[in-house]
């Protein structure tokens, strides 16, 4: 009982001591100021205009996420397009992400950045890609079936052994002279 009480007191002391050692800047370690967080969902046209100005957008282009309780607030709903689709030859302020300073980022930028999902249109339509894939698989299955039904073997000659075809090792009479075996070389 005394050991358990000492253990609890030791843990409580350690928690109190660690609170005093924590650096003061630990609260702002995320580098997100309160100005960067989305505000409440805009209900009036004036609030929409203020939110559009906050995100450097025109009022006509600004559309917030729906207020469904996910916590998006007044953050603008940007098109679901990856950074691959943006012009690679433009002089971006941040070329790795293809973003300019002050430009709103997509809420799911970590998914749509250049290392992840590429939403660029493909040069071949989806049904053509499926036809090519399943056509190749069907052809390979057909060829495996043909190879199974009609097996092909490498032609071979009879096995050749040295010393007159292993005459003595195969039980030949040592007093007789074995007949000569001609070995062929290719």
Swiss-Prot record:
Pfam entry (one): NDUF_B8
One GO biological process term: mitochondrial electron transport, NADH to ubiquinone
Transit peptide limits: 1-28
Superkingdom in the source lineage: Eukaryota
Major subcellular site: mitochondrion
Listed transmembrane segments: 133-153
Entry keywords, A to Z: Electron transport, Membrane, Mitochondrion, Mitochondrion inner membrane, Respiratory chain, Transit peptide, Transmembrane, Transmembrane helix, Transport
Membrane topology: Single-pass membrane protein
Location in the cell: Mitochondrion inner membrane
Any single GO CC term annotated in Swiss-Prot or TrEMBL for this entry: mitochondrial inner membrane
Presence of the UniProt keyword Nucleotide-binding in the record: no
Subunit note: Complex I is composed of 45 different subunits.
Family: Belongs to the complex I NDUFB8 subunit family.
Function: Accessory subunit of the mitochondrial membrane respiratory chain NADH dehydrogenase (Complex I), that is believed not to be involved in catalysis. Complex I functions in the transfer of electrons from NADH to the respiratory chain. The immediate electron acceptor for the enzyme is believed to be ubiquinone.
PANTHER family the UniProt entry points to: NADH DEHYDROGENASE [UBIQUINONE] 1 BETA SUBCOMPLEX SUBUNIT 8, MITOCHONDRIAL (PTHR12840:SF2), NADH-UBIQUINONE OXIDOREDUCTASE ASHI SUBUNIT (PTHR12840)
Name assigned to this protein: NADH dehydrogenase [ubiquinone] 1 beta subcomplex subunit 8, mitochondrial
Organism expressing this protein natively: Gorilla gorilla gorilla (Western lowland gorilla)
